[in-house]
Amino acid sequence: MIPSTWFRRLIFGLFILEVAGALMWLAAWLVPNPADKAFAQTVAGMVFLLGFYSGAPLSARFLAPRESDDQAMRNRLVRVLRELPRSRPVFLYDHDEKNANTVGILASQSRVYVTTGLMAHVSDEGLKGILAHEDTHVVEHHILVTFSYACAYVLVANEVNSNHLFIFGFIAFMTLRRYLEYRADAGAAKLVGKEAMVTGLKELNAIYPSKSWARWFMTVMAYPPLPMRIKALETGRKVLF
């Protein structure tokens, strides 16, 4: 029996919390001087972030362990990839969840994961846009950018103990994430054409319709609502707040 995705995510989340807690405890235990404990835990936090981002390919394999053996779907994926001027290694996983994502802190270790559930609900044109979007994340080092921001935030938080800093840092991080999504959409449009990327976004919006209230909560969202991403491609106007 293979556990469901939600169960694997629960186990993985608990494991991550245990590792983070263990690193913080170890840092505090190794440094006897109370004045140096905060800095030691800051270093431990950065080590944790490095391990978390670097180990993302392994975590993706844990969350989606079954590589698809559907030959027709694999052939279709290969055919679409051949239409892309460039692409990362793409792995097709047998799962009903409709998803595609990129993991790996460095371009050399990055992997793109696509589920059979997504492929069954998008056209070849839409799939081409989605894959180009994920490839742009790799080429422009978006995961490395978010990792660098997280490290910078940890360092600043060590120097400035403020609730306002926490709130500002969180909002800034979410804004950065939304900006990088717009960048990936624009990069995909340059790579395979605007129509392919718009098609991909429209098909994703059909799968996951955006709620009417999402616009008002965008400040704390990691992804802009899909209609806004489509409009940004069509007009060139990116709305971050």
Where are these regions (language model features)?
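Active-site recognition of the HExxH zinc-binding catalytic motif
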Residues: 114, 129-142, 184-185
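Catalytic Zn2+-binding segment of zinc metalloproteases
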Residues: 135-151, 195
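Short, membrane-interfacial amphipathic segments enriched in basic
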Residues: 124-128, 142, 220
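Active-site-proximal gating segments in proteases and membrane effectors
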Residues: 82-111, 174, 188-241
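Short, Lys/Arg-enriched, Gly/Pro-containing loop segments at transmembrane-helix junctions
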Residues: 66-69, 184-190
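Short pre-active-site segment immediately N-terminal to the catalytic Zn-binding motif
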Residues: 113-129
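Hydrophobic or amphipathic, alpha-helical segments that drive membrane association/targeting
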Residues: 1-95, 140-141, 153-163, 167-179, ...
